[in-house]
């Protein structure tokens, strides 16, 4: 399926020369050269299939592939996620003159980043969000009020994955100018940039477009935060997404309740979208050239409940003010309670540290420790099940040998 007539290349999908060596090595491991495979990027994952994007003769092509585990660069089998680069081959007997053949992913290229979030259930492992993300955009509405705790948790996830993080404030036209200024000037710690796209003066996604230009950006936020509205605005420059009909909507949006600003889950699965290229632009149009080179957006479903990351170092990075005071404590294992020489308690006493922020830090650290313990217990159970299964198989083999011997 051809997406649109344009001058597309792999670079349009976020590829750059540093990936080339990994692709060549993966092809060699599979027993061929790069010319024997199609290099594609996973744009969506459904229950039974993947959607892949690649290019052919300057056109962006959408491919379909059955859902199956693929070997990664460690020789282990796992399922590709949105944002992954994969080597594929067409499946014989599929496709037609008007429809590309189905493809079979054979290898996943090494990931530069792997964004995950803890599962809301006790027994599940971390849930993948996207791979090879350069920047995480936290989309947070100004109405009824931004959740600092939620922003801090998203920020910690970004730090755990090694990606930059930006806070994008939406629905600023529903609060006073003073409130918007306050939200913009006093964000949660750890974010690299704070932008507001919606004010009394209109909806302006240009600062976000400039921020994500040439990068792969993932958008996370609660349901009704305005993620899909923002993505539509980035995909359709000059069109106000609040007043637009569904004619220009790539991502369908829905209304939110006036009482609490909450909405239904509009985006039901993660989807990777390519920012429009500079079609028809002149060679000297450097602005369009920059915006068309590898700018990729990943829209995600709204998150109702977000657990803390199990990476305590990422939490310390998010709460760098708290961890800075903690490093000055007399004892390295200080619990920041009643120990003598506690620099954190001193900062709380003299007003240098916000008590509410410190309490959020304590809760996240405690939750993180419980998640690590739960993960260890889960790994132990899995290992024990594998050990028991191997023992049973061994006993069956031994009994069959004894039976034959008799």
PLM segments and residue spans:
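Structural detector for short beta-strands of small beta-barrel domains
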Residues: 36-48
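SH3/SH3-like beta-barrel fold
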Residues: 50-55, 88, 105
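Canonical P-loop GTPase G-domain recognition
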Residues: 164, 171-225
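Helix-rich effector regions associated with P-loop NTPase G domains
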Residues: 1-8, 15, 33-36, 72-85, ...
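Walker A/P-loop
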Residues: 223, 228, 233
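Beta-strand/loop nucleic-acid-binding surfaces
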Residues: 59-79
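Conserved beta-strand segments of the P-loop GTPase G domain that flank and frequently precede/overlap
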Residues: 137-142, 168-170
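Histidine-anchored nucleotide/phosphate-binding helix
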Residues: 149-160
């Amino acid at each position: 399926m051809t997406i649109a007539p344009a001058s597309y290349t792999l670079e349009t999908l976020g590829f750059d020369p540093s990936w080339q060596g990994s692709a060549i090595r993966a092809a060699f491991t599979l027993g061929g050269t790069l010319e024997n495979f199609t290099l594609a990027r996973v744009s969506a994952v459904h229950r039974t299939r993947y959607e892949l994007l690649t290019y052919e003769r300057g056109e962006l092509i959408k491919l379909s592939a059955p859902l199956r585990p693929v070997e990664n660069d460690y020789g282990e089998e796992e399922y590709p996620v949105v944002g992954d680069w994969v080597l594929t081959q067409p499946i014989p007997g599929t496709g037609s003159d008007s429809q590309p053949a189905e493809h079979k992913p054979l290898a996943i290229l090494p990931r530069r980043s792997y964004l995950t979030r803890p599962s809301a259930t006790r027994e599940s492992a971390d849930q993948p969000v996207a791979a090879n993300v350069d920047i995480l955009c936290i989309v947070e509405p100004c109405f009824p009020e931004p959740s600092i705790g939620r922003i801090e948790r998203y920020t910690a996830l970004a730090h755990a994955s090694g990606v930059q993080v930006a806070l994008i404030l939406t629905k600023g036209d529903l609060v006073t100018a003073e409130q918007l200024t306050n939200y913009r000037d006093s964000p949660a710690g750890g974010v690299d940039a704070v932008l507001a796209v919606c004010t009394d003066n209109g909806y302006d996604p240009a600062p976000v477009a400039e921020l994500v230009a040439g990068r792969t950006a993932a958008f996370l936020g609660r349901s009704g935060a305005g993620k899909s509205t923002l993505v539509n605005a980035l995909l359709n420059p000059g069109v106000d997404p609040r007043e637009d009909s569904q004619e220009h909507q790539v991502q369908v949006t829905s209304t939110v309740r006036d009482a609490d600003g909450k909405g239904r889950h509009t985006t039901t699965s993660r989807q990777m979208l390519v920012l429009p290229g500079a079609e028809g632009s002149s060679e000297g149009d450097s602005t369009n050239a920059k915006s068309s080179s590898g700018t990729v957006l990943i829209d995600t479903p709204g998150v109702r409940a977000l657990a803390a990351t199990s990476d305590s170092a990422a939490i310390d990075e998010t709460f760098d003010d708290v961890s800075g005071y903690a490093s000055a404590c007399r004892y390295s294992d200080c619990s920041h309670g009643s120990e003598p020489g506690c620099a954190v308690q001193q900062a709380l006493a003299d007003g240098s540290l916000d008590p509410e922020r410190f309490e959020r830090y304590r809760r996240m650290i405690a939750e993180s420790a419980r998640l690590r313990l739960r993960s260890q217990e889960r790994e132990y159970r899995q290992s024990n099940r594998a050990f028991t299964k191997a023992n049973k198989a061994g006993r069956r083999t031994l009994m069959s040998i004894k039976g034959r011997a008799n």
